[in-house]
A protein has these predicted regions:
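Sec-dependent signal peptide recognition
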Residues: 1-7
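Hydrophobic h-region of N-terminal signal peptides that target proteins for export
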Residues: 7-16
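N-terminal glycine-/serine-/threonine-rich beta1-alpha1-beta2 phosphate-ribose binding loop
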Residues: 17-123, 136-155, 417-420
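A structural signal for well-ordered alpha-helical segments within the folded catalytic domains
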Residues: 57, 109-112, 116, 139, ...
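Short helix/strand-capping hinge loops at secondary-structure junctions
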Residues: 122, 128-130
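A contiguous active-site-proximal alpha/beta segment in oxidoreductase catalytic domains
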Residues: 132-209, 223
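Rossmann-like dinucleotide-binding domain that binds NAD(P)(H)
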Residues: 207-324
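C-terminal helical cap and adjacent loop that interface with cofactors, partners, or active-site loops
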Residues: 228, 233-238, 245, 249-250, ...
Length: 447
């Protein structure tokens, strides 16, 4: 039965009633990503936003961020937040129906239930990742997609990394066979695709130190590392390596998966949370030395349509001054490897490199690369290359380096486009299902 349902979702494009004016509902905004959706105004979106939450510091921080956007000197927003707080906040939102799109970014333990209930109530949903953190959540998510299809609604997760310029260019160059060749199949010991990221609990958002809720350290509420940031990395593998293609979960084979913990002391816990002790719900994860063991790290190797891919996510307490979250991405073709590095040599900014793997001379290869870059500049004027020790560095003008926070607006604009036309790109829904199916297989294999 499940195979039939998935096949139907893949075969039928997502179609909904066109929405010309979007009225946002913000549900229990426990994560700062909820505010980043509102970092700019959108012509299609009503400036009045109804917020439903239980109240408390997480809501206060969300409203403070919106106020910062509203009062900044350059291009301020003009959102009007209408807030309801109380234990019945979710029921109140459903009863009032003050909007037609729900933004969900908060405690992940509740997210899949919220998503399904919102869809069943006839509301479109724009959800932060991950939409599911356990196999039970994934079953709810499958139901939500089926309900959305039946009701003519759009459910979409916020995949910001598709809008990072180095990722866009890596994808674009891989489509030029004269430079990249064809994608290699790789092996478990030498995958053809590698996506790795390192994140930090302590960092700045919108120029201010980020406050984390204590539950962010609870994998039962935030999710383990193997099901969280991995959503971005699996999504990019599908989006970059197989552009505009729909997947079915049966095209994925999970080979190996593991998880491991990051130790967090009370002092480290206090810095982003303000708490000088571990809450009771974290006590089962505290060792005999009073150190919290957070299973926020995960890695797995799998095949997708026969191509071997490796995913790895790590979380650490705090980055060194001047550094931050980092990303490494490698796609290996028969003629070249396309590699994004973001380490010390790159001043912790992502840079794309083209590394020759063919017997062509450097001069011959560079001619082919120049032709490919010339075609890419039709969409991205100013892109260039320069020779470097490992091959060629792709030079990106500053105008395209908009930063991670701006990507939330870009995702929102894409979602608004889907709502305005009443049509979603036909591969989006099946690929979201395949993505979460892949991650859940890794989760189960890592136990």
């Amino acid at each position: 039965m499940k195979t039939i349902i998935l096949a139907t979702l893949i075969a039928m494009p997502a179609i909904a009633t066109e929405i010309k004016e979007v009225r946002l509902l913000t549900l229990d905004p426990g994560h700062f990503h909820a505010s980043l959706v509102q970092k700019k105004m959108y012509p299609q979106v009503n400036p009045v936003v109804h917020v439903y939450a239980p109240g408390g510091p997480e809501l206060d921080q969300h409203l403070k961020r919106i106020e910062i956007f509203n009062t900044r000197p350059d291009n301020p927003t003009h959102w009007q937040e209408k807030v309801y707080t109380g234990p019945d906040f979710f029921e109140k939102m459903i009863a009032e129906r003050a909007g037609n799109v729900v933004v969900i970014s908060g405690n992940n333990a509740k997210k899949a239930k919220y998503i399904l209930a919102c869809i069943q109530a006839g509301l479109n949903v724009l959800a932060d990742k991950p939409m599911a953190i356990t196999p039970a959540d994934f079953r709810l998510l499958e139901k939500a997609f089926i309900e959305a299809r039946n009701r003519g609604l759009f459910l979409y997760d916020i995949m910001t990394e598709r809008y990072e310029i180095t990722t866009i260019l890596q994808r674009a160059l891989s489509r030029h066979a004269t430079v990249f060749g064809r994608m290699e199949d790789g092996s478990p010991d030498n995958p053809a695709i590698t996506k790795e990221s390192v994140h930090y609990y302590c960092k700045e958002v919108a120029g201010k130190p980020l406050t984390r809720p204590p539950w962010f350290y609870d994998v039962k509420q935030q999710g383990e590392g193997i099901v969280d940031v991995t959503t971005h990395l699996v999504d990019l593998i599908q989006w970059e390596c197989f552009p505009d293609q729909a997947f079915h979960p049966r095209e994925v084979t999970m080979l190996e998966a593991r998880r491991w913990a990051t130790p967090i002391t009370v002092a480290e816990f206090k810095k982003p949370t303000g708490f000088d002790h571990f809450p009771d719900y974290l006590k089962p994860s505290v060792d005999k030395n009073n150190v919290l063991q957070v299973y926020c790290n995960g890695a797995f190797i799998y095949t997708i349509r026969g191509v071997h891919a490796k995913i790895s996510v790590e979380w650490k307490h705090e980055a060194q001054p001047g550094t931050g979250d980092t990303h490494y991405s490698m796609m290996r073709g028969t003629k070249a490897a396309l590699v994004i590095r973001q380490g010390k040599d790159q001043n912790f900014k992502p840079i794309l490199y083209v590394e020759k793997r063919t017997r062509l001379s450097d001069a011959e290869f560079e001619r082919a690369l120049r032709i490919a870059i010339g075609k890419i500049t039709q969409d991205w004027p100013g892109i260039d290359t320069k020779k470097c020790a490992s091959g060629w560095e792709v030079v990106v003008p500053d105008q395209y380096k908009v930063g991670h926070e701006a990507h939330f607006s870009q995702v929102t604009e894409k979602y608004l486009e889907y709502l305005a036309t009443g049509k979603m790109t036909e591969w989006e829904v099946p690929n979201m299902l395949t993505k979460y199916s892949t991650i859940m297989r890794a989760y189960k294999l890592s136990r």
